[in-house]
Amino acid sequence: EKLLVSGGPYEFMQRCPTFGCMAWVIDRQGNVLHSWEVDTDKLFAQIPNLAGKTKPENFYPSGIALTPDGGLVMAIQGRNTYPFQIGLVRIDRNGNVVWKHWNNSHHWIAVAADGTVYAPYREAIDGKTHFGGTAVETRCKANLGAEGIGVYAPDGKLLRRISLLDAVDKSDFSGLLYGLRTGCDP
């Protein structure tokens, strides 16, 4: 059995001495079978719409998944940044960036056998006063934070976005939105 271990910038420097290992695969005896080192200075340069401490060491993979060809897809989070959910990065087996989307994707992702990537995302919705066709007010003075699932082709092309808020709105369970503690974060 093999285990996929997440790392980050400057982690496991014995194995990845320049930038650290973003992830590595080990067997049950602890032998490292493969690792991914990425030039984090290049990877994390010019992330748009991000405030806070944007040094590479403040970014880390919060979700990782292997691709069918031995590459890796990572959901990147930020410490001391706003927003904290940064986006998705696909790297090849050698640690080269294949594609990246700084689109507020976050946490646990999944890669299907055909290479399709499924990743949760967060988006800010401005001007929404009610949830769907209900009488439930959002009570937001600022943007509403909504979640969804992004579906990506193996080449990184966005195929579809599935809004979880819209799915609940259109279901027979839209009344669940009435019990929200804060109307800005369903």
Which role does the model predict for each range below?
Residues 1-186:
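Histidine-/acidic-rich catalytic cores in large beta-rich domains
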